[in-house]
């Protein structure tokens, strides 16, 4: 009997609950050709959109969604008036060049203020320092200048190295030519001694 009841029960899926399978079987038995719209409306979910908007987007809160009423950058206030804008810039440039020329003429005889102040301040600082601190400062300034001049030193070293290599190449070429000439003279000397020996042999015989 247990086997017969097990065969009569419908097969259930893992994710379905008991009520959904039995209700669907009963509904299909009662309404074999029920409307699809009714079945979809039972399964579908309706959202209360106004409630969602009121909950998640209240009118009195912006949640960081501020609206900025500024123009996009770069902003030119005279974009509409092209003719006026050109004449304004020309007038401004003419005034700026005139005032700049006057300022340059007035400043020609003057020494720069920042250099004079810098020299005075360094003298005052040195007088306040102890001899040990002055020596440390002098060494620091010397190391700093060496560090800043290191790029120049590297360039000079490269030039000297390339010059030495070029000079070495010239010396090697001169040695090779001198060695070649000495070889030629030795060969000619050996040839002459061989001919002398042959002449001596011919005379003696």
From Swiss-Prot:
User: Where do the record's region annotations for Required for binding PPP1CC lie?
Assistant: 12-17, 43-55
* Bias (Polar residues) ranges: 17-26, 182-205
What is the phylogenetic placement of the source species in the record? Eukaryota, Metazoa, Chordata, Craniata, Vertebrata
> Region annotation Disordered: residue ranges?
1-44, 64-92, 107-148, 171-205
Q: Which residues carry this modification: Phosphoserine?
A: 87
What is this protein called in UniProt?
A: Putative protein phosphatase inhibitor 2-like protein 1
The UniProt entry's sequence similarity note says: Belongs to the protein phosphatase inhibitor 2 family.
Tell me which stretches of the chain form a coiled coil.
none
Report the gene name.
PPP1R2P1
State where composition is biased (Acidic residues).
80-91, 121-130
Q: Provide this UniProt record's keywords sorted from A to Z.
A: Carbohydrate metabolism, Glycogen metabolism, Phosphoprotein, Protein phosphatase inhibitor
Biased composition, class Basic and acidic residues, residue ranges: 30-44, 131-144
Q: InterPro entries this protein is in?
A: PPI-2
- Looking at the keywords, is Phosphoprotein present? yes
């Amino acid at each position: 009997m247990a086997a017969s009841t097990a065969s009569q029960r419908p097969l259930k899926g893992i994710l379905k609950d008991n009520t959904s399978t039995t209700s669907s079987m009963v509904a299909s038995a009662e309404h074999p050709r029920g409307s699809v719209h009714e079945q979809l409306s039972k399964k579908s979910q309706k959202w209360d959109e106004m409630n969602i908007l009121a909950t998640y987007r209240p009118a009195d809160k912006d949640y960081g969604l501020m609206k900025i009423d500024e123009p996009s950058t770069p902003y030119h206030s005279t974009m509409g008036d092209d003719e006026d804008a050109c004449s304004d810039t020309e007038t401004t440039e003419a005034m700026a060049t005139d005032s700049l020329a006057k300022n340059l003429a007035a400043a020609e005889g003057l020494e720069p203020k920042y250099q004079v102040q810098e020299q005075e301040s360094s003298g005052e600082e040195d007088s306040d320092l102890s001899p040990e601190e002055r020596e440390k400062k002098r060494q620091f300034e010397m190391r700093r200048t060496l560090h800043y001049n290191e790029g120049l030193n590297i360039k000079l070293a490269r030039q000297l190295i390339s010059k030495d290599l070029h000079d070495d190449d010239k010396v090697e070429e001169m040695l090779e030519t001198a060695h070649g000439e000495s070889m030629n003279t030795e060969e000619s000397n050996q040839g002459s001694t061989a001919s002398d020996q042959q002449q001596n042999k011919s005379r003696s015989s």
